């Protein structure tokens, strides 16, 4: 069971000036033993436990930008100061002048125990840019410099982990809504898709019941695995929402979803959450 609040990604985001509901989106591709996933809508804090479950013993915060923590001159606080405000112990690794001006590289990296990541992403604030990558617990300053060099020289569409033998998962979040991740773990893409289904259903139930949050079960792994086996790209939209039942229409797409792509006229499948029995099922759409 997971808790889904009324301030989650599906609740606070919308599409267009008409503020249409934000769709579930999921795409996955595999190459050379790496899985690359783009998905939405999810806040980093809504996925953090999945990241922790497959990560090395430590995590490097590569980039962190937010308007939630500002100094007296209304400038964003440095990530290390944000971690201190949240009571998260970490090691600060300055990158130096060589990294200045390199797209995606900050002035410093934060390294912390992976189990502290949920405390950092505790839901009380929102990063509009966030990049994380796992590292060994005994990572050296030289290795962190090498990591930063790889991050700064890898193209957006190039595989990253193939150049980083010690890392298992890389996460990048934009607007605390859009998710891009790369992993060596073949089970993580299905876990992300299962979480998205739960987040969409849970946000609808929280709004319906006017409760601060709802508790919903996650689908068993066979449901997202069945979807991924059928097609790599999916879009989802809420259907029926009652206190007993939530349905989500799912349609396969020819390409990854982009903002502006509407849900097709006809769904291919329907995911149904039986709230009272705590079960999920997938059926052909009627």
Predicted features, each with a name:
Residues 1-286:
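Structured alpha/beta or helical-core interaction and ligand-binding surfaces enriched in interleaved
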